Amino acid sequence: MPRSLKKGPYVNYKLIKKIILNNLNLKKKKIIKTWSRSSTITPEFIGNTIAVHNGKIFIPIYISENMVGHKLGEFAPTRIFRGHSGSKKKPKK
């Protein structure tokens, strides 16, 4: 079930604080590391690179306009599908 509109989007307060400070720095924007996969992307995030933790490593994500409204965790997959096992039959001669 989606979040109530009257509550507004959830964004970790430390993350939004880092984003605002990064937006004020016009010379060089830093990559911001975060473990907050449940934070919603808001318009303030656009143009920043955020490294989202997937449980093992940080995956850098450049935030663009069409990502607004999605969660950060959607862009950092936690599982890697390696394929189903092949058939164990030997080929006939």
UniProtKB/Swiss-Prot annotation:
Disulphide linkage map: none
Entry GO terms, CC: cytoplasm; small ribosomal subunit
Presence of keyword Ribonucleoprotein: yes
GO molecular function: rRNA binding; structural constituent of ribosome
Top-level taxon: Bacteria
Iron recorded as keyword: no
Function (record text): Protein S19 forms a complex with S13 that binds strongly to the 16S ribosomal RNA.
Name recorded for this polypeptide: Small ribosomal subunit protein uS19
